[in-house]
């Protein structure tokens, strides 16, 4: 119980701290999966909240290998250091990521420096990796298109239609909402009219009733006098 | 009839019956539409099952020498968000003498029960005062794509003298109210 709580804390911490690094994120979540189900779910929540959808899919591919390689507590050290070892924008292939982790263990390097020193052109590196991403996981390419430079031509079309559809749906929804409001307003107006109508009718009927009462009272009086006169003979 | 100001058609304006189907008009005749003694009021919801047989339509106005035409349409076919078949014609009765009801008129298009499939539909009853008694045989190849405005122009009916609408949706639809 205690240890699981500890794992929980660690994983949460890592999920927060490494949100910029994609590959390490996926590693962290798969680790969580190994350790405890609850932690896993929490990590997922964090990932989903960050709308980093495609890491999940990446992750599935890496999972078995990581399971085999790092089944123990020892990796938690590496794991915590990982975010600092990884260059944030280019997610390196899974094998290299684990190697790096193993090599640099507890020697954190600032990520931007790594990027600059290892690659002369950051942009190209980025493009390459994202294309790898595309190749390995076609479903993720729409998300990766958000990062710019790559796959514009291929991404454009489906992205546009998707945006278009969303826009249309939004417009439709607004129209529907407006109709709903109008319906409600019409209904309310009608009820108000009915109330006004009933009120005037009620007032009219009340007056009529009063008049009838008075008429009845005077008639009764007349009747009474008549009755008395008719019963007079005795 | 005394308190028939412009307020009376407010619900028709809010419900966009005036606009979608009719032009602005001043109601001058009282019309009562009721299904099984339940009076139809603007914007109220009725269930398709409760409107399956034709309603009683009373005209409290004019006299026996004046004649009225009643039209019932659905401007939300097939669905209110894209009513590309509008308007759908449900009923036409002509030559209804004033102070009577629709059964005294001539039914030229039989009553078709409302069967809204997509969304919430409006069903509108429109009453016109005829200039004279006349027999019309409207040329209606299909109940879809009917146009009340055009119909009024074609038969020289002028502006409506009364209108009322109710809402209806599928019997099984999820209702929030």
From Swiss-Prot, chain A:
What happens when the protein's gene is inactivated? Slightly delayed flowering. In the plants missing both FD and FDP, fd-2 fdp-1 strongly delayed flowering, even in the presence of high FT levels.
Organism from which the protein derives: Arabidopsis thaliana
What residue spans carry the region label Leucine-zipper? 191-212
| The record's account of how the chain is modified after translation | Phosphorylated.
- List each copy of the bZIP domain by range: 163-213
Can you name this protein? bZIP transcription factor 27
Positions of the UniProt region annotated as Basic motif: 165-184
SUPFAM superfamilies given in the database record: Leucine zipper domain
Instruction: Give the location of motif Nuclear localization signal in residue numbers.
Output: 152-159
* Chain's role: Transcription factor required for the transition to flowering promoted by FT.
Taxonomy of the source species? Eukaryota, Viridiplantae, Streptophyta, Embryophyta, Tracheophyta
From Swiss-Prot, chain B:
Q: Name one Pfam family in it.
A: PBP
InterPro entries linked to this entry? PEBP, PEBP-like_sf, PEBP_euk, Phosphatidylethanolamine-bd_CS
Please give the annotated consequence of changing residue 113 to N: No effect on terminal flower formation
Q: What does the UniProt record report as the effect of altering residue 88 to Y in this chain?
A: Early-flowering and terminal inflorescence
Q: Where in the cell is it found?
A: Cytoplasm
Q: From which domain of life does this come?
A: Eukaryota
Tissue specificity annotation: Expressed below the apical dome of inflorescence and coflorescence meristems, and in inflorescence stem.
Question: One GO term of the cellular component aspect?
Answer: nucleus
Mutating residue 105 to D leads to what result? In tfl1-1; early-flowering and terminal inflorescence
> What does this chain do?
Controls inflorescence meristem identity and is required for maintenance of an indeterminate inflorescence. Prevents the expression of 'APETALA1' and 'LEAFY'. Also plays a role in the regulation of the time of flowering in the long-day flowering pathway. May form complexes with phosphorylated ligands by interfering with kinases and their effectors.
Q: What is this protein called?
A: Protein TERMINAL FLOWER 1
Give the organism, scientific name.
Answer: Arabidopsis thaliana (Mouse-ear cress)
